[in-house]
């Protein structure tokens, strides 16, 4: 009799020796899929669960006469200009399931943004890395939004706790109450993002309203969950750094007895990924957040009795 097939999850990266994603030295697992579409997103390749392709012009050897991908795309998504440079029709490419261009490329110019793992395969990676953590570390599930693959994640979490692996999550909390509560039963530490307190402004820049997000955070804060919760705010000048929004965040935290927040200054490190996905990056001209302004925001939280960490300087 054949054994039951294991659940598979789609993962776009696994990083060992992460020191900014929770207490101690950790393995961070990046799961595909996200209900948000933040205009500043550093990991836009994570938005869909299904595999899709990225193209790096810097890795492509078209200028050296390489033609290995010519004629490989049977769907007509791939053509070439007079300089031999690949030209991609992303409207066709997004529905591809065969990825002949990826399979043909010697130089990783075409690459997939998702790799399937079974539960046991991923747990084996985590257990292997646990030799590096010893008692100080664990695994952090990030994304994308890891809760979108909640059935797979739940099975992995159960196996992690069987071998006493500390579990953390980085989440938008933008999932149903049922899914959120089920997963958090097996979470020891959490970063949860608050992009903006105003629901309309939140939707304008992320594609979704924030009602469900705030509801899940409130429910968690007022439950008997005994893990550690740190809110995170990606600080973006002109979007969510106003006195009004900061005051609203503080009021929300006081109302729910939340005591820790992490301010992450905006960066453009993911811009090249947008180009590789054929997407327009609207934040290319957005300036960095002034360090002095970040210190002012930090002082406001501290003056209101909230532990506030800036960037990767956290109390771990």
Curated annotation (Swiss-Prot):
Q: What does this protein do?
A: Catalyzes activation of 4-hydroxyphenylacetate decarboxylase under anaerobic conditions by generation of an organic free radical on a glycine residue, via a homolytic cleavage of S-adenosyl-L-methionine (SAM).
- The UniProt annotation places [4Fe-4S] cluster 1 binding at 34, 38, 41
**Which EC class heads this enzyme's classification?**
oxidoreductase
Positions of the 4Fe-4S ferredoxin-type domain: 84-115
EC number(s) reported in the record: 1.97.1.-
Cofactor requirements of the protein: [4Fe-4S] cluster
Positions binding [4Fe-4S] cluster 2 in this chain are: 60, 66, 69, 105
- Annotated ranges, domain Radical SAM core: 20-307
Cite the binding residues for S-adenosyl-L-methionine.
40-42, 144, 193-195, 267
Q: What is this protein called?
A: 4-hydroxyphenylacetate decarboxylase activating enzyme
Question: Catalytic activity annotated for this protein?
Answer: glycyl-[protein] + reduced [flavodoxin] + S-adenosyl-L-methionine = glycin-2-yl radical-[protein] + semiquinone [flavodoxin] + 5'-deoxyadenosine + L-methionine + H(+)
Q: How is the cofactor bound?
A: Binds 2 [4Fe-4S] clusters. One cluster is coordinated with 3 cysteines and an exchangeable S-adenosyl-L-methionine.
